[in-house]
A protein has these predicted regions:
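Extended, non-catalytic structural segments that build the interaction scaffolds
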Residues: 304-311, 318, 349-357, 390-402
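Amphipathic alpha-helical segments in well-ordered regions
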Residues: 77, 247, 365, 369-373, ...
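C-terminal non-catalytic interaction appendages of large macromolecular assemblies
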Residues: 161-166, 204-211, 220-221, 432-497
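Extended hydrophobic-aromatic, low-complexity segments
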Residues: 298-299, 334, 346-349, 358-361, ...
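Basic, nucleic-acid-interacting segments
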Residues: 2-314, 325, 331, 353-356, ...
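Strongly charged, low-complexity linkers/loops
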Residues: 381-395, 401-475
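Core structural elements
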Residues: 206-219, 287-288, 324-348, 359-376, ...
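Structural motif
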Residues: 15, 328, 352-362, 399-402, ...
Length: 497
């Protein structure tokens, strides 16, 4: 059938069918060198084929050496998802032929993964859902194909082997996911977990996190699985949800029309908003897995695993729960903070710098102004905020020494210059006038200079108060305490006959 969904397709096929979805995630591990050689993984922007050696080029006689840190990061991920760890594992060759695979096989793990039988609980619109994780295993990445056109118009495909051999972790769920939203939430939570434990930067835009989905439908109440279709090329979390939603509707329309679905791999087109046929789906038998004779089995000692367990930090779900239960934060603030490791670190450090401040006050500044500064910063620009300086700014605002608007300006200046908050406040003359006598004199001058506004107030126009307050703030170059100014203006207006 056509990739396009018929107009007659049911708007809600899940009333007749149950979707069965499994998600496979490949993430690039945060290591300095490749999986089986010493070549650097920092090849963004590097000249093609400049980070290569005989091992990652697959040259005859070159022997692989295991990257210990890559193994540790997968073991830590297994601990974070409450998975089982084997006493020993091994490496297998996954055989297939493609230009981006220099050896003609990929070193992976087949039946003895480093982690198995894990789980991850995610929050959805219908409440928490626990998704089983079948396995997490190590493998090496392929090279990158670059498709180009020569000056004389010929279509060519070029191979850049800089990426070849980069350590990857593949994480495969059980077929526990029932909606596209659940799949998206799972991918988002997994990205956060990987970043929190330091396993991966997991940046989808840079190809460090790749999500694939296996989607099938079965009639409501049936036990047997339907025909599985793999969906690739989903380059954002929104794409994950859109692609799975589309595939559910497409398969339902085909089944309703009496068609037989085929096992295939389909790509997702963000522009067209639909999936398209790529190739027939391979099975594990097609890859002819067998143990790699160049790599010995790997034994996971209990003391090694215990040391890695101590490295695993507080996980996002536990952190959200603590922020709500112990610090009294709203679910929104807890979620936003826990979703950003840098924001979490700044929040925690600022509270530690001044325990007298409320968690809510600090959360407001971190989730509001700090994240805003990060979002508006130019690409590659550094936004560094020191916890002690943020604490000083918050104290100054809450004490009424500076206005909140000026506090935001001080924070922005500190983030780019690193200057101390107290010096920035002094340089800019932001210290608020809170002396009641001085404020009263400024208010009296403004009230006397604007009799029309006074008359408007007498006539019941409350906006006149705002006008007069604004004039006082202008006259004091924004240094007056706005709350005290408003209070004094009302006192003066109400006291006049």
């Amino acid at each position: 059938m056509s990739a396009s969904v018929p107009a007659t397709a049911s708007a809600d096929p899940l009333t007749r069918y149950e979707a069965v979805v499994g998600v496979e995630v490949h993430c690039q591990l945060r290591t300095a060198s490749k999986m089986f050689c010493a070549c650097s993984t920092d090849h963004d922007g590097a000249a093609p084929n400049s980070h290569v050696c005989p091992v990652c080029l697959g040259l005859p006689g070159a022997l692989p050496v295991i990257n210990r840190r890559a193994v540790e990061l997968v073991l830590m991920t297994g601990l974070a998802i409450d998975a089982a760890t084997p006493a020993a594992t091994r490496w297998d060759r996954k055989n297939y032929f493609y230009p981006d695979l220099p050896k003609g096989y990929q070193i992976s793990q087949y039946d003895l993964p480093l982690a198995s039988a894990g789980r991850l609980t995610v929050e959805t619109g219908d409440g928490p859902v626990t998704i089983g994780i079948t396995r997490a295993h190590l493998e090496e990445d392929t090279a990158k194909l670059v498709h180009a056109t020569t000056p004389d118009g010929r279509k060519v495909s070029l191979v850049d082997y800089n990426r070849s051999g980069t350590p990857l972790m593949e994480i495969v769920t059980d077929p526990d996911i029932r909606t596209a939203e659940q799949a998206r939430r799972y991918a988002e939570e997994l990205q956060l977990l990987l970043r929190t434990i330091g396993a991966s930067d997991a940046d989808m835009e840079r190809g460090q996190l790749r999500v694939e989905a296996n989607v099938s439908l079965r009639p409501r109440g049936a036990d047997a699985f339907g025909t599985r279709v793999e969906v690739k090329n989903m380059n954002s979390f929104r794409s994950v949800e859109r692609a799975i939603d589309f595939e559910i509707v497409r398969q339902a329309a085909a089944l309703d029309a009496g068609e037989t679905l085929r096992m295939e791999t389909r790509g997702w087109s963000d522009d067209r908003g639909e999936t398209y046929h790529m190739r027939s789906k391979e099975t594990s038998d097609d890859y002819r897995y067998f143990p790699d004779p160049d790599l010995p089995p790997l034994h996971v000692a209990a003391d090694w695993l215990a040391g890695l367990r101590a490295e695993v930090p507080e996980l996002p779900a536990a952190r959200r729960a603590r922020y709500e239960a112990d610090l009294g934060l709203s679910p929104y603030d807890a979620r936003v903070l826990a979703a950003d490791p840098d924001a979490t670190a700044l929040f925690e450090a600022t509270l530690a710098a001044d325990p007298s401040m409320t968690a809510k006050a600090v959360a407001n500044w971190v989730t509001g102004e700090y994240l805003r500064l990060r979002n508006v910063a130019s690409p590659g620009a550094a936004v560094h905020v020191h916890a002690a300086e943020l604490a000083a700014i918050i104290r100054s605002v809450e004490a009424g020494d500076i206005s909140r608007a000026n506090g935001k300006e001080v924070l922005a200046a500190h983030a780019t210059s690193g200057a101390a908050a107290v010096d920035l406040i002094a340089e800019r003359g932001f210290r608020q006038i809170s002396d009641r006598t001085a404020l009263a004199e400024a208010v009296d001058r403004v009230v006397a200079a604007h009799p029309a506004a006074v008359a408007d107030y007498r006539a019941g126009k409350q906006q006149a108060v705002g006008f007069l307050v604004g004039q006082v703030m202008k006259a004091t170059r924004g240094q007056a305490n706005a709350a005290m100014v408003q209070e004094t203006v009302r006192e003066r207006l109400d006291a006049q006959p």
